[in-house]
């Protein structure tokens, strides 16, 4: 069988995107006739959106907020066809243990945030407001890329640090920081990451998208049925720079809070919640229709077909 090659980008290199790494490692894509090669956008040399728009790639992981942003500016639509992460994968760290942490503890403090994407910041604003904290009373610094943000926190700048894995587990293990909150738990279920493509690819190659989504759903079912040790072992070849114990703990923390979607269906309720987060945070100004940014027709078929298999 001749495999259909696909290069799939992830916004940044992290085990947060384990469903992609696991799908490739377990052979689920190959069994659907796809030769999927994945890499981080930085290594590819283009952002996920840029690579899709200029035709360099056909499928990418990305936040739905990317398409909200494009639509809000009246630009070309990038539809999302399968949900991957149903919670934020970010965590809030402090310099010292804070067993009685309250969100009001951030008032007057500086949070060194994540600069590479706006969704973690927008979710933070929502969590603050929900807990009675005026976001203007908290200084959220989002100017530094990850390496510089990490160096700044280690150098004593800022009071809190918001980051994802593996940095979270690495800092907890070294004693440099202490976990005070999971943003995934604090924000609640939200379609944080999904697969996006172009309208033309959905129209011209629906069978390729179907095979890809069937592989995703098979991987999602596998992830739901295995423990952190098994998942970390499966994806380890894709993350050779992460020490095995750190990777297993990172996967375990993601898994315990149901970070990864159990199926590829991006539901309207999640879409509406994310839109509310982005509107109240000032990231978008208009209200957008679910049908304009999301196409679940192939995902729904993929679920039916996988579940019908013996």
Locate the predicted segments by residue.
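Short, glycine-/small- and polar/acidic-enriched structural segments
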Residues: 2-133, 140-143, 159-165, 176, ...
């Amino acid at each position: 069988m001749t495999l259909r090659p696909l290069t799939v980008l992830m916004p940044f290199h992290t085990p947060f995107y384990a469903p992609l790494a696991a799908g490739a490692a377990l052979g689920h894509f190959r069994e659907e006739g796809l030769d999927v090669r994945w890499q981080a956008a930085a290594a590819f040399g283009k952002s996920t959106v840029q690579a899709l728009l200029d035709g360099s790639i056909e499928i990418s992981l990305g936040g739905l907020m990317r398409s909200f942003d494009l639509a809000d500016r009246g630009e070309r639509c990038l539809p999302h066809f399968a949900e991957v992460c149903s919670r934020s994968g970010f965590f809030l760290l402090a310099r010292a243990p804070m067993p009685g942490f309250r969100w009001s503890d951030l008032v007057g403090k500086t949070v060194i945030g994540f600069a590479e994407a706006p969704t973690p910041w927008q979710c933070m604003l929502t969590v603050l407001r929900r807990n009675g904290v005026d976001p203007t009373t908290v200084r959220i610094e989002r100017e530094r890329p990850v390496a510089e943000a990490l160096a700044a926190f280690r150098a004593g700048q800022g009071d809190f640090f918001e980051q994802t894995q593996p940095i979270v587990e690495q800092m907890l293990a070294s004693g440099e920081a202490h976990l005070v909150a999971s943003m995934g738990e604090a924000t609640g279920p939200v379609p944080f990451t999904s697969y996006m493509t172009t309208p033309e690819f959905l129209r011209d190659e629906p069978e390729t998208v179907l095979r890809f989504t069937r592989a995703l759903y098979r991987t999602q079912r596998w992830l739901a049925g295995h423990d952190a040790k098994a998942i970390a072992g499966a994806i380890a070849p894709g993350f050779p720079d992460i020490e095995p114990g750190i990777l297993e703990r990172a996967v375990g923390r993601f898994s315990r809070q149901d970070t990864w979607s159990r199926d590829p269906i991006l539901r309207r309720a999640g879409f509406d919640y994310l839109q509310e987060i982005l509107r109240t945070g000032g990231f978008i100004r208009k209200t957008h229709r679910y049908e304009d940014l999301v196409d679940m027709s192939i995902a729904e078929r993929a679920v039916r077909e996988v579940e019908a298999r013996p």
